[in-house]
């Protein structure tokens, strides 16, 4: 048990590997939107001081100058390709509705209207989030790795080369499930979907027992079929086991009705659910249905490759994400984004991006 762990006092131990969370933009970048000296100038006025006179007039003039500088900084931030790419992953709709109009705005000619202040605040909101909030998302919220080493005294950081060591685009599990449901609706695919017995069904010598129910006698043929429903055998394989006289599809339909088995194309939980689905489709024994099912998946995978190729180019990324959603809707006939709610897990879009931070951190004995 001691291998791979760090001992603490008493019986406590820690795993020697740790995840390092942080932002993908420099933390001090947030100070760009804090005009130097403005807060100190405002502090000169107490709660009972009259907001008038020469001193107040000077502060108003300073505030106007600071606001103009902050707006210029916000425009420079919004023009950055990495910033717009990060926003594209979060909410690409605001790129056209807010970011683009803000970049086309000239404070010297149009003035700081309410609408432009709202857009400036939106840029500031995203910039603060990207600089100082430890989101775990894409290149603007990468996750790194570190380790405990009690032989060292403090904290050691190896910065690596660049902010991220690697980035990858993954399918959301729900989007693969939606694709599996659509493919499973094809009657030609179902015989090649392996049924499995549900976990709470217990098989006895000549009966089936489920929780809170008395044993239910079943025919030997049904009991044998239940034993064979292990999630690996297709209908043709089950038919070979039971012989030509058994009506396996009818028996399976009855077991589904009794809720003793699950008979559908299921995708196990996995960081790469698309690979699990592809492996299941490649096991379809008939060339026609197999090719048709894989063609649907290939069409979606081709669109996802476009997202990978876009990387941090905001224009290409927006086009690629749009293409993924349009392809997904056409192939699955399902919505390309899940509505946010208290029961919705992270990953509401069809695909998401994760990145690994280039830096590596070592925590020494003084930290413990």
Provide a role label for each language-model segment.
Residues 1-163, 220-221, 228, 247-368:
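Type-3 copper protein
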Residues 140, 147-202:
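Extended, Lys/Arg-enriched charged tracts that mediate electrostatic binding to polyanionic substrates
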Residues 169, 240-241, 249-253:
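Composition- and surface-driven signal marking solvent-exposed, interaction-prone regions
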Residues 171, 217, 230:
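Catalytic cores of large soluble enzymes that bind and process phosphate-bearing ligands
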Residues 189-193, 215, 253:
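A general structural signal for short secondary-structure junctions and capping/turn motifs
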Residues 194-224:
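Short alpha-helical segments that sit at the start of domains
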Residues 204-206, 232-236, 278-281, 355:
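Short acidic (Asp/Glu) and glycine-rich catalytic loops that position anionic groups and cofactors
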Residues 226-237, 241, 245:
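Short capping segments at the starts of secondary-structure elements
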